[in-house]
């Protein structure tokens, strides 16, 4: 897909900071979603989050930069990203009632590995033999966590894996959008359409499949929130909005292959939340898979930094007789 976009500035330090903050917000949001799924369908929760985000972002954008900033020639990319997000995270949350919190997110965190692969395929970001080997190790960790063929295998484990694919693709789309549109606009066009996208998904699923009582969180229904849960719905929407804004910003201003490994900070947060909130102790296979996935991601990030420094040195050497005279980028790695 070829789209004329403004070339985004590369600011890795700011990008990493935004991504780490987004992981904290995402973990908090997902924990609240797991609780709310006991009473409300996933379509309603994602739809409410989209409505709350729209109610906040739309007037904020108009106030900050004017209504004209909403106009964009990149609307096909924004719509594609919205579909990927809504579809992927509907499947992600659908797995929560059947699996432990840490188990679901461990499988989902094949996404950074897939992001690195998609970045090589679509953005021509290089993956050398070292990082290629690390990707293989990471995917072995995913297989261990999913445990296909084992007696404990659950088909719902495929749902967060599909979400990982859509998430990785959405970050590649974000990089294509670059900084042509502001982070607020990107967030609005990702979250606002989700209200309608998940409604169509929920209606379609229930139209073709007669869901049993164990799938009540997938029924197409929008019950009136109780006084006790309404504040949590609002807080979840606000926290989710900030999470998406931060992660959109991160992938706009830094290479996808550099950002991807820092997504793994979510995993230890999820393990702690799962134990504290639900008393969950993931099986050994989940811990082994998680360890391999994290090790793979950290090594990929390390190789990215090494490669960037070598490329910078090669670029500087032929043009500067004295290293001291060479200007350095303040945001370089």
Where do the model's predicted regions map?
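Loop-to-transmembrane-helix transition segments
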Residues: 14-20, 67-91, 155-161, 212-242
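C-terminal transmembrane-helix exit sites in multi-pass transporters
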Residues: 111-136, 268-287
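Transmembrane alpha-helices of multi-pass small-molecule transport proteins
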Residues: 2, 14-15, 40-87, 166-170, ...
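Transmembrane alpha-helical segments that form core, pore/gating elements
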Residues: 152-214, 223, 311-333
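Hydrophobic/aromatic residues within transmembrane alpha-helices
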Residues: 36, 45, 49, 95, ...
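C-terminal-most transmembrane helix of multi-pass membrane proteins
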Residues: 2, 268-333
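Hydrophobic transmembrane alpha-helices of multi-pass small-molecule transport proteins
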Residues: 130-147, 163, 285-304
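Helix-helix packing/entry segments at the starts of transmembrane helices
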Residues: 105-110, 177-193, 241-275
């Amino acid at each position: 897909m070829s789209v004329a976009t403004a070339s985004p500035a590369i600011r890795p330090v700011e990008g990493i900071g935004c991504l780490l903050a987004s992981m904290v917000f995402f973990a908090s949001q997902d924990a609240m979603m797991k609780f709310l799924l006991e009473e409300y369908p996933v379509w309603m929760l994602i739809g409410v989050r989209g409505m709350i985000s729209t109610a906040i972002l739309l007037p904020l954008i108009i106030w900050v930069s004017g209504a004209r900033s909403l106009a964009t020639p990149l609307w096909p990319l924004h719509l594609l990203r919205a579909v990927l997000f809504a579809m992927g995270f509907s499947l992600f949350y659908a797995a929560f009632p059947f699996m432990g919190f840490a188990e679901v997110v461990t499988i989902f965190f094949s996404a950074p590995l897939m992001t690195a692969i998609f970045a090589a395929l679509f953005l021509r970001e290089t993956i050398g033999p070292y990082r290629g080997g690390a990707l293989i190790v990471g995917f072995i960790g995913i297989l261990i966590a999913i445990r296909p063929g084992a007696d404990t295998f659950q088909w719902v484990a495929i749902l967060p894996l599909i979400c990982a694919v859509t998430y990785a693709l959405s970050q590649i789309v974000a990089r294509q959008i670059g900084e042509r549109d502001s982070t607020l606009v990107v967030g609005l066009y990702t979250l606002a359409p989700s209200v309608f996208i998940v409604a169509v998904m929920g209606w379609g699923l229930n139209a073709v499949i007669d869901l049993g009582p164990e799938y009540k969180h997938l029924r197409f229904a929008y019950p009136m929130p109780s006084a006790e849960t309404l504040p949590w719905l609002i807080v979840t929407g606000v926290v989710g909005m900030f999470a998406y804004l931060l992660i959109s910003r991160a992938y706009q201003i830094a290479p996808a292959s550099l950002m991807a490994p820092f997504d793994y900070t979510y995993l230890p947060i999820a393990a702690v939340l799962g134990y504290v909130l639900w008393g969950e102790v993931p099986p050994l296979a989940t811990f082994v898979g998680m360890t391999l996935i994290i090790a793979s991601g950290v090594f990929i990030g390390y190789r990215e930094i090494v490669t960037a420094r070598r490329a910078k040195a090669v670029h500087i050497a032929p043009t500067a007789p004295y290293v001291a005279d060479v200007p350095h980028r303040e945001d370089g790695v």
